[in-house]
Amino acid sequence: MRERIITFVSLLLVALLSFPSVSYCDDQTILYESFDEPFDGRWVVSEKAEYQGVWKHEKSEGHDDYGLLVSEKAKKYGIVKELDVDEPLNLNEGTVVLQYEARFQEGLECGGAYLKYLRPQEAGWVPQGFDNDSPYSIMFGPDKCGATNKVHFILKHKNPKSGEFVEHHLKFPPSVPFDMLSHVYTAVLKSDNEVRILVDGEEKKKGNLLSAEDFEPPLIPSKTIPDPEDKKPEDWDERAKIPDPNAVKPDDWDEDAPMEIEDEEAEKPEGWLDDEPVEVEDPEASKPEDWDDEEDGEWEAPKVSNTKCEAAPGCGEWKRPMKRNPAYKGKWSSPLIDNPAYKGIWKPRDIPNPDYFELERPNLEPIAAIGIEIWTMQDGILFDNILISKDEKVAETYRQSTWKPKFDVEKEKQKAEDEAAGEADGLKSYQKKVFDLLYKVADISFLSAYKSKIMELIEKAETQPNLTIGVLISIVIVFLSLFFKLIFGGAKAKVEKKKPETAAETSTSEAKTEEKAEAVAAPRKRQTRRES
């Protein structure tokens, strides 16, 4: 009984202690979408004709965790969720954290996975009409296609003078992770105009909303601009260097000397076949049966390399090679000297910018909804755990509890796959080294009688790599057989010479000649196979 009371009190204390924390998180969380349940009813798919992509409620590969899935390739997608709040989220007060997960399960070659944080729309707007023209306050997230590879952070800020909304892009944003793992993207906006971009909880970029070094175009225009009415004077000389007017071409400067001349010291290689053409007609070619001389013209056999040239240093007319002409100097030109009339590169004078204004704090548009409006060539993009919070600690808590466990599992799986692939590559590399060694062994001169057999074994092993060990054993046996033959059988073979066996010796010689021919042909065959 006493133990039950202690247990009950402990549970009560835990509940009481955790209650303020839960309330604190709820107070700081404007939106959290886990996609644990089907998104129908909470998210509205655009009904515009161009958005044909089908959104699905699917599990992330290898997990029981659900997300919002891009299910088809080469489609436009549009979906939106309005914030369930009384008033749109004010971005000009305190800290605001935007965070979500994205996973490219099929990789990403050309497509986006960014979110648009929509400002309040015009009267009469409905979520079903969401499209690319629906105005947003912030666009944030990965985008990759061609030369584009960045995690966008774009502000649409209203110019206080013109009243027009202008896109301001964060300069030098982080790159998109190139793997197929789950990644979490976080943007933190602070009240001191600081903006931070995190990928997987690690800060990748920090900037200031009002800094011209961090945003293009800058939110605050420059105080001065080039005078559009100013024009360069006609006598303004921008040439820093000019040809020396007093320079004279040297008398020994030959402008007509060629860059290359024949090498008079070169001699025609011995054995050069002057009367043999480099190419000859293919003797095995025959005129096609359907060839019509009147329509197709006179048939000519295709050309092939002249086999006689393979053993010779060359065929056809021999010509001396060319070499660089030591007397070559090229066209003469006057050396350059400093221009005494040089005034520098002209630029218009600066005048006060009529569009200049000052800001202590950007007037960011509030957020009323979240939209995903993308055109992607890949399917398998999964969105999950979309969060808008006023506290960085809340965002960190969600990263650790929702993203980190999945990422760790995926990372371990990827590591195991990479190791397996590495072992396979290592085995292939080992086999290649073995075969290279075996080919060198086959070329040893005193093994010429066995070369055809060794080559046959090697070629068989190359087509069936699992036989590599067996081939090694076979070649070792050949070595041992030859070794014992040389030690125990070599002397007797030299002493005995019988005339009746001359025919047999001739036959053996012919056999060896054939084997040598095969041995010569075998490396050539091997080279061709390797080159192909």
From Swiss-Prot:
Species per Swiss-Prot/TrEMBL record: Arabidopsis thaliana (Mouse-ear cress)
Gene3D superfamilies cross-referenced by the UniProt entry: 2.60.120.200, Calreticulin/calnexin, P domain (2.10.250.10)
Similarity section: Belongs to the calreticulin family.
Protein name per its UniProtKB record: Calnexin homolog 2
Region (P domain (Extended arm)): 225-358
Biased composition (Basic and acidic residues): 226-242
Membrane topology of this protein: Single-pass type I membrane protein
GO CC annotations, alphabetized: endoplasmic reticulum membrane
Composition skew (Acidic residues), residue ranges: 252-283, 290-299
